[in-house]
């Protein structure tokens, strides 16, 4: 299975394409889209073009995107939301199911530490994947793809390809592994 991980941003959009065969993970392609010092609409257009070309080239089966971090300032959250919208649109336009993960969930799945810093993310990318990401955005995107591959058995798509209903039905069949406070399963 090949998965595209996207760390959205309006100035730098990290991407990582990771393939899994059995327990083996291989980086297909990774990098950072840098649209330049342009007005917002043009930067977003360049990111969309870059993601479209990447999806056509790498042919991932699914996409995973980092969810919005609400601790940012309102303006930063709005700008990040626009960049996320472009990433979601590129994946949906290609017919890819899209999965979203909180930053702490990505860090926990990738490093074992939900509060990992940039240096730890870069080191883990080198150790786990043999990758040498130049920027933290690239390492984060690789981590998002790896997180999705690790969580894939229980993931429910956020958008795309009409597989959401089947995934929700499968998730509904899962039973909790512990009892609730009333002692019922």
UniProtKB/Swiss-Prot annotation:
Q: Which CDD domains match?
A: RuvC
**Annotated positions binding Mg(2+) 1:** 7, 137
- Which enzyme class? hydrolase
The prosthetic group or cofactor this protein requires is: Mg(2+)
Mind listing the GO molecular function terms for this protein? crossover junction DNA endonuclease activity; DNA binding; magnesium ion binding
Could you tell me which Gene3D superfamilies the record lists for this protein?
Ribonuclease H-like superfamily/Ribonuclease H (3.30.420.10)
Provide the active-site residues from the annotation.
7, 66, 137
Q: Which InterPro entries match?
A: RNaseH-like_sf, RNaseH_sf, X-over_junc_endoDNase_RuvC
Tell me the residue numbers annotated for binding Mg(2+) 2.
Answer: 66
Q: Where in the cell is it found?
A: Cytoplasm
The record's Gene Ontology biological-process terms are:
DNA recombination; DNA repair
Give a short account of what the protein does: The RuvA-RuvB-RuvC complex processes Holliday junction (HJ) DNA during genetic recombination and DNA repair. Endonuclease that resolves HJ intermediates. Cleaves cruciform DNA by making single-stranded nicks across the HJ at symmetrical positions within the homologous arms, yielding a 5'-phosphate and a 3'-hydroxyl group; requires a central core of homology in the junction. The consensus cleavage sequence is 5'-(A/T)TT(C/G)-3'. Cleavage occurs on the 3'-side of the TT dinucleotide at the point of strand exchange.
**Oligomeric and partner information:** Homodimer which binds Holliday junction (HJ) DNA. The HJ becomes 2-fold symmetrical on binding to RuvC with unstacked arms; it has a different conformation from HJ DNA in complex with RuvA. In the full resolvosome a probable DNA-RuvA(4)-RuvB(12)-RuvC(2) complex forms which resolves the HJ.
Q: By what name is this protein known?
A: Crossover junction endodeoxyribonuclease RuvC
Identify the coding gene. ruvC
């Amino acid at each position: 299975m090949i998965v595209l991980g996207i760390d959205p941003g309006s100035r730098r959009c990290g991407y990582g394409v990771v393939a899994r065969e059995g327990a083996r993970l291989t980086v297909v392609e990774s990098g950072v889209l840098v649209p330049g010092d342009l007005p917002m609409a043009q930067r977003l257009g360049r990111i969309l073009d870059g993601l479209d070309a990447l999806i056509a080239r790498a042919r991932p089966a699914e996409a995973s995107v980092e969810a919005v971090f609400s601790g940012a300032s309102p303006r930063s959250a709005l700008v990040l939301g626009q960049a996320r919208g472009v990433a979601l649109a590129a994946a949906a336009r290609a017919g890819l199911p899209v999965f979203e993960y909180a930053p702490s969930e990505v860090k926990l799945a990738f490093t074992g530490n939900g509060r990992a810093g940039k240096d730890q993310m870069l080191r883990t990318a080198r150790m786990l994947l043999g990758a040498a990401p130049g920027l933290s955005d690239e390492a984060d995107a690789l981590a998002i793809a790896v997180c999705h591959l690790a969580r894939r058995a229980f993931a429910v798509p956020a958008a795309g390809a009409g597989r959401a209903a089947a995934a929700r039905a499968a998730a509904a069949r899962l039973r909790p592994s512990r009892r609730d406070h009333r002692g019922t399963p």
